[in-house]
Every structure is written in C-alpha cells, then in structure tokens.
Amino acid sequence: MRPGDPEQVRDLFDRIAPSYDRLNDALSLGLHRIWKRQAIAWLLPEPGQRLLDLCCGTGDLALVMAEKVRPGGLVLGLDAAEAPLRQARRRAARQGWLPVEFRQGDALDTGLAEAWADGAVMAYGLRNLADPAAGLQELRRVLRPGARAAVLDFNRPSDPQGATAAFQRFYLRRLVVPLARRAGLEAQYAYLEDSIARFPGADKQRRLALEAGFAEARHRPLAAAQMGLLELVA
C-alpha cells in the first residue's frame, strides 16, 4: 500500500472499521481515550460553538465534543470512508440528544465556508493525507481567527536510531501487527510503520502549520514521545 494514496487509505479504513475501536483499546491499553480528551481540552470548548472533527472515523471524539457544546452548538464529523461513518451514525443514534452530524467528505477540500468552525480536531488523520501541508491549509481556512485546533497522531522520533524509535519499531512489529493478524488485518496495520516514516516530524509540523497561516503552533509529545499533539491557534 502507498502511504497517502486517497483511494487506498479510504479502502483501508473501510476494511478495518468493524475492528477499529476494539483494536485501539487493546493496542493503547485504553490510553487513546485520554490522549483524545487532551486534544479536546486544548480547544476550550463551550456551549453554542460549532466544532469540526476532521477524519472523524467512528466518531468517538465527535460525540465527546458534542457533550461540550450543548446547548445550542453543533459538532460536524467528516471522513472519507463510509464504513466508519456508518458506525459513527449508529453511535450517535443511541445518544440522540447530542448535537452531532456525520458526513462523508475530503479533509483537503471540506466544502465548508471560510471561518465556519470555532475549533477543530484531527486524530490519526493528518498522517494519512496525500498532502499534509494542504490538509493544514484547509484546516486553517475553515477556522475563525483565534480559534484553536488540535492534531493528534503518532510521533515520528527525531533520532531514527534512538531508544524512542527502537521502542516504536518493537511496538509496531511485535505488538500491533501480531494483534492485528488475529483480526485478519495484518496487511492493513503493517502500513502503520511506513506511514509514520513519511510523516513530518514535530519541527516540520510546526513549520507547516505556521506556513498554513496559523498564528501559533506547538507540538507536545505524549506517551513517552510515541504520540504527539500539535496544538494550534488560528
């Protein structure tokens, strides 16, 4: 699989959607929920706001954010793959009081009006875009001035020969792929290592964000620098 290929990435997430949440819990020992809440906390969400979840997947972040913007607000989740969106809509239907909507869409061309959102998150999505720089530009375009955004993803270690990178390789090859193999998804999760290798590191992410028009950008390592949170102000 070619990292960043839009059609292949969409097919990948359609394929893994039924097992995605279960594998996330197992592979992170549930810690992904904490990291995602840290991303949401950066937004300082308030009732009445319109928030955007780009590459929303099965909708777990969007549903948490929807609790924060009640009453009077709205959370819009966009994803290119239809199978995760079906799961997101089913989850939302069980919590029908939440102001959340899910649509199929392209993170590089959302179709939203300029300055539409009061805040946005993108979790494990920027790394999978064909053009991460263009993704950050579109993210900036749809945010009102002064709005906050958070981009959560795997962190590419700065030293490929260092201990952090060595642990990441061990984790991906000896834990992630074997567990995915049990679910019949070995090929899909083997893609992770290649996608991380081509993903911009922390310094480049900050630079790309500033070039995209963000006023502030900082990258915060999480989970012993295995994950990273790019915190942005439009």
Each model region followed by its residue ranges:
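Conserved alpha-helix/loop element of class I SAM-dependent methyltransferases that forms part
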Residues: L29-Q49, V64
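A short acidic, Gly/Pro-enriched loop at the edge of an enzyme's catalytic core
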Residues: L108-A120
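Core SAM-dependent methyltransferase catalytic element
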Residues: R206, A212-A215, P221-A234
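C-terminal alpha-helical "lid/dimerization" subdomain adjacent to the S-adenosyl-L-methionine
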Residues: E7, N155-L208
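Class I SAM-dependent methyltransferase SAM/SAH-binding core
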Residues: R50-D109
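A short SAM/SAH-binding and catalytic strip from SAM-dependent methyltransferases
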Residues: D118-P132
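A short glycine-rich, Lys/Arg-flanked "PGG" loop and its adjoining helix->strand segment in the class I
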Residues: A133-R148
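N-terminal, positively charged/glycine-rich alpha-helical extensions of SAM-dependent methyltransferases
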Residues: M1-S19
